[in-house]
Amino acid sequence: MHSNNKTLQRNYKDKFNKLIHEIKFRDNKKIFKKYQNLKKEIIAIIPARSGSKRLKNKNLYKVWGKPMIFWPISELKKSSYVKDIYVTSDSKKILDYAKDLGVKIIQRPIDISDDLTPKMKAINHAVEKILDKNKKKITIVISIQANSPEITKSQIDKCIEHLIYNDFSEVVSVDKNLSQNGAIRVMKYPYNFQETLSTNFGCVVTDILDIHTIKDVNKLNIEKHEV
């Protein structure tokens, strides 16, 4: 690597490191009071389309004895902050399963269900449907990836706390190399409608495995077995 590129890479990582903090959210009474005002307005949306190509029916593929989407839904239910959980999908099977788990469902139109449609387009379609139906104010929108079964309640809550504590516009999960992994994205409303990542953002290291293939599933199973 060219020396100038190495310098740029170091500067880039230094910048990101300044945005990654271990925080004691509940110790800050002022911020906790601010959260209390937001509590009923934090929603989580899981986009889960049916047309996966590399791993058929990926979002319902069983890992650790349960359909993959079960795990992020289960962890969201444990969250100290998330009020409502939604699954948006073009698949009746996925929507029926999500409904059986006790979460709210949104029918995703076919024209935004192909593999070229950006994830945020599905998220924002869901947000608009929620606003139209419930006439409720939304303060924070959380995008949770269905094919990231390693997501934990602790990671979700840490991202929410990080956003509120530092008054970020959004917080994203990143891997150990500080690259965005897409597993968790927490956004203040209406920053979710921006096409690009906000300049006022923070990140939380999660290093979550993103499942796309059988090889990924096997790696996940091995890692779980070794724990």
Where do the PLM segments sit?
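Intrinsic-disorder-associated, low-complexity terminal segments enriched in Asp/Asn/His/Tyr and depleted
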Residues: 2-5, 11-14
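Hydrophobic helical membrane-anchoring modules
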Residues: 7, 16-25, 36-38, 200-227
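N-terminal nucleotide-binding beta1-loop-alpha1 segment
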Residues: 20-56
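Short phosphate-binding loop-to-helix
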Residues: 24, 86, 92-142, 151, ...
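N-terminal glycine-rich phosphate-binding loop and ensuing alpha1 helix
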Residues: 41-88
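Short beta-strand scaffold positions
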Residues: 88-89, 211
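Conserved core of the sugar-phosphate nucleotidyltransferase
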Residues: 116-125, 138-140, 145-215, 222
